[in-house]
Design a protein with these regions (language model features):
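N-terminal basic, amphipathic alpha-helical segments
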Residues: 1-56, 195
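Conserved core of the PLP fold type I
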Residues: 60, 64-198
């Protein structure tokens, strides 16, 4: 009798990651009239609503999307255009379709890690640092190495010593209002970081 070999089940971290990706894709899917868990009524219920009349007093190009739905997963188009102009004023050329707005730092960090970090990569982080960050490279199977954080930023001697031993793919540090210390990079430490990065 012919018997097919069944593939072995995926590793637990892979299964969990696939489940999360599937859930994220479902959240971005916008073909449902009523989206359970969204907390917003169907668009047809909002026609003629007092809230819609209130929003129509603003100078918005698309009143129907303001406050009633998620809109583009890339972010609010007029804001992306405004950011393009602000970047251009700083001699940075960008197009609105090349700008992605995130729902906050955790969303941004997650996107960066998913696209840049491979299993086995080394990642430097502030120590102490922003603890919600630490699980993300761990899930990506990266090696996390802490860089001592002082009152004026990362300890440059510690960073230099660890750079001599490791080749990090990225160093996650926070320049202003560091979490949890509240410290801000001094100009000297900022310059030192630039020199070490070269």
């Amino acid at each position: 009798q012919f018997q097919l070999d069944r593939p072995s089940p995926p590793a637990p971290h892979v299964a969990a990651a696939v489940d999360v990706v599937s859930l994220l894709r479902e959240q971005l899917d916008q073909h449902y009239e009523v989206r359970p868990g969204d907390g917003r009524p169907p668009a047809s219920w909002m026609e003629g609503a007092e809230l819609k009349r209130y929003f129509s007093s603003f100078r918005t190009a698309d009143v129907d999307t303001v406050g009633f739905g998620y809109g583009s997963s890339w972010g609010y188009a007029p804001l992306r255009e405004r950011l393009r102009v602000l970047l251009l004023e700083r001699s940075i050329t960008a197009q609105p379709d090349g700008l992605l707005l995130t729902h906050g730092v955790n969303h941004g960090l997650d996107l960066i890690i998913r696209h840049l970090i491979e299993p086995g990569d080394t990642v430097f982080v502030d120590d102490p640092g922003y603890y919600p960050l630490f699980a993300k490279p761990t899930l990506a199977k990266a090696k996390i190495i802490g860089i001592s954080r002082g009152h004026d930023g990362p300890d440059l001697e510690d960073l230099a010593a660890k750079l001599a031993l490791h080749r990090p793919k990225v160093f996650f540090t926070q320049s202003l209002a560091h979490n949890p210390t509240g410290s801000t990079l001094s100009p000297a430490v900022s310059f030192g970081l630039m020199q070490l990065a070269e």
